[in-house]
């Protein structure tokens, strides 16, 4: 516990909050170009082929970002929108690609949570 005199001389040191998504540089999303689209396997208890893309952002960073949902249309040189948000079982993946924005198509046949996957409402009139 510091004395009053020590606090007057030095003061309290501010705790600096470290960003969880530094490549976005204080922006909610960033545009980028896919440099590589591939699949990778998750950490130990899980097993799958997770779809990821290496993206060069307009901020100059090159990051690995996750492609959510079933099926995608991304290739090399696709323009994508990247948001923050890590994938717990993929080490080094701290970003998500926004579905339904720029070159990324929404998920086909999605009925629930459509806004998260960029899917338009299915026409209820057709039966």
Swiss-Prot record:
It comes from the Bacteria. GO terms for molecular function: rRNA binding; structural constituent of ribosome; tRNA binding. SUPFAM superfamilies: Nucleic acid-binding proteins. This is Small ribosomal subunit protein uS12. With S4 and S5 plays an important role in translational accuracy. Interacts with and stabilizes bases of the 16S rRNA that are involved in tRNA selection in the A site and with the mRNA backbone. Located at the interface of the 30S and 50S subunits, it traverses the body of the 30S subunit contacting proteins on the other side and probably holding the rRNA structure together. The combined cluster of proteins S8, S12 and S17 appears to hold together the shoulder and platform of the 30S subunit. The modification 3-methylthioaspartic acid is found at residue 89. Belongs to the universal ribosomal protein uS12 family. It holds the Pfam family Ribosom_S12_S23. Keywords: Methylation, Ribonucleoprotein, Ribosomal protein, RNA-binding, rRNA-binding, tRNA-binding. HAMAP family: Ribosomal_uS12_B. GO terms for cellular component: small ribosomal subunit. InterPro entries: NA-bd_OB-fold (IPR012340), Ribosomal_uS12 (IPR006032), Ribosomal_uS12_bac (IPR005679). Part of the 30S ribosomal subunit. Contacts proteins S8 and S17. May interact with IF1 in the 30S initiation complex. It comes from Nautilia profundicola (strain ATCC BAA-1463 / DSM 18972 / AmH). GO terms for biological process: translation.
């Amino acid at each position: 516990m510091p004395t009053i005199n020590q606090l007057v001389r030095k003061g309290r040191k501010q705790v600096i909050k470290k960003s969880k998504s530094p490549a976005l540089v204080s922006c909610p999303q960033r545009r980028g170009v896919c440099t590589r689209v591939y699949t990778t396997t998750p950490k130990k208890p899980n097993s799958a082929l997770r779809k990821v893309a290496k993206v060069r952002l307009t901020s100059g960073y090159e990051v690995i970002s996750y492609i959510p949902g079933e099926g995608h249309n991304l290739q090399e040189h696709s323009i994508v929108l990247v948001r923050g948000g890590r994938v717990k079982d993929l080490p080094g993946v701290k970003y998500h690609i926004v579905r339904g924005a720029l070159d990324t198509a929404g998920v086909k046949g999605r009925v629930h949570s459509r806004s998260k996957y960029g899917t338009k409402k299915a026409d209820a009139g057709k039966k």
